[in-house]
Amino acid sequence: CYLSERLMLDARENLKLLDRMNRLSPHSCLQDRKDFGLPQEMVEGDQLQKDQAFPVLYEMLQQSFNLFYTEHSSAAWDTTLLEQLCTGLQQQLDHLDTCRGQVMGEEDSELGNMDPIVTVKKYFEGIYDLLQEKGYSDCAWEIVRVEMMRALTVSTTLQKRLTKMGGDLNSP
């Protein structure tokens, strides 16, 4: 299973959509800013092995989709842009799903306990916590939008890294 250029194009389009969703000046929301502990070094360094990189990428995209595909999110954003973003994230997940069974196979049940996956889940828990603490305010969503741009940039970096690893997710 090979990662396609389509996956990278979808990723870039999703980043553009997030940028267009900007409704407030991020500077007006600095008081709500929080370090969510984006595990960037995990992606950019050599901490992830090839067999871990795919599940981490999948988890980041799935969690991103889940975050924006909610009732609270629908109330916060322009519906058209939000739908386009969710569609783009779903397209990325669908593409990865074609590889998922081949790559993960029987190990799938163990991946939920894999340290990098747990790190990604904790990262998104922090994002949900901020939204709840701030009552899903416009500023909270703006902080989340900016943070998700960082997260999707990291996901894109991980996709590039997987491609450099050969793109064939079945090879050792």
Swiss-Prot record:
InterPro entries: 4_helix_cytokine-like_core (IPR009079), Interferon_alpha/beta/delta (IPR000471). Constitutively and exclusively expressed in the mononuclear cells of the extraembryonic trophectoderm. Keywords: Antiviral defense, Cytokine, Disulfide bond, Hormone, Pregnancy, Secreted. Pfam families: Interferon. Disulfide bonds join 1-99, 29-139. The keyword Secreted applies. GO terms for biological process: defense response to virus; female pregnancy. It is found in: Secreted. Transmembrane segments: none annotated. It comes from the Eukaryota. The keyword Ribonucleoprotein does not apply. SMART domains: IFabd. GO terms for cellular component: extracellular space. One of its GO terms (molecular function) is cytokine receptor binding. Belongs to the alpha/beta interferon family. IFN-alphaII subfamily. IFN-tau genes are intronless. They evolved from IFN-omega genes in the ruminantia suborder and have continued to duplicate independently in different lineages of the ruminantia. They code for proteins very similar in sequence but with different biological potency and pattern of expression. Paracrine hormone primarily responsible for maternal recognition of pregnancy. Interacts with endometrial receptors, probably type I interferon receptors, and blocks estrogen receptor expression, preventing the estrogen-induced increase in oxytocin receptor expression in the endometrium. This results in the suppression of the pulsatile endometrial release of the luteolytic hormone prostaglandin F2-alpha, hindering the regression of the corpus luteum (luteolysis) and therefore a return to ovarian cyclicity. This is Interferon tau-3. It comes from Ovis aries (Sheep). The lineage of its organism: Eukaryota, Metazoa, Chordata, Craniata, Vertebrata.
